[in-house]
Every structure is written in C-alpha cells, then in structure tokens.
C-alpha cells in the first residue's frame, strides 16, 4: 500500500466520468498505445489521452464505452500525442490494464467521489 494521504489532498484530484468518442493507435509510441478521445460534457469538453490499454481494448470495443479519468493533471506529450487526462484502470503484475467503468450509464462529466 502507498503512504496515506489526507482527505484534503484526495479532494484536489478531479476524477470524472466520460464517454469514449474516438480511438486510434498511437503509431509513434514505443509500447502499444491508443489515442483515446473522451467527452466529459459541457464543463470540461472533449479531452484526449494516450493509454497503454491495447491488451483488452481497441477501436471496436472501446468507442462508446464510459470511462473514469483524472482530469486535472498537467498536459503531457507522450510519443507525439498531447495527453490531457489519465484514464483509470487496474494494472496486474504483467502490466495489463483493465479499465474502471460505471455499473450503469451516467451523465458525462459527473465527478467521482
């Protein structure tokens, strides 16, 4: 387990629900990655992420799926892609990511608490 944080620190992390609207391979990445565009609703808009999630996910099965992401990290250039959000998932001992999803469809942009 990582070191404990306070509720005030956790509360600074802006975690939101969004819907994937486009997916394509990041051809410039050293490790297989996808460029994922996510619609977070009117307040935040559409943001993109470069994500190493190709073991289970591709354009066909990810487009239209709701995901959960950290929206207030600084932008980061990853293999020529400006990554604006961090899509959340569990990572197993081999580095394979399983995305976190809501159990029911909900409005884009809703905060996760």
Task: Cite the ranges covered by each PLM segment.
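Phosphate-backbone binding interfaces of nucleic-acid-interacting proteins
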Residues: 1-113
């Amino acid at each position: 387990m990582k070191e404990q944080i306070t509720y005030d620190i956790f509360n600074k992390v802006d975690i939101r629900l969004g819907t994937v609207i486009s997916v394509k391979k990041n051809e410039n990445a050293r490790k297989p990655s996808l460029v994922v565009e996510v619609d977070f609703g009117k307040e935040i808009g559409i943001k993109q992420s470069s994500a190493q999630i190709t073991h289970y996910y591709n354009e066909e099965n990810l487009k239209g799926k709701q995901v959960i992401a950290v929206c207030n990290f600084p932008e980061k250039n990853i293999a020529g892609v400006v990554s604006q959000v961090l899509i959340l998932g569990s990572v197993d001992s081999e580095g394979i990511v399983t995305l976190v999803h809501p159990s029911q469809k909900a409005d884009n942009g809703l905060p996760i608490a």
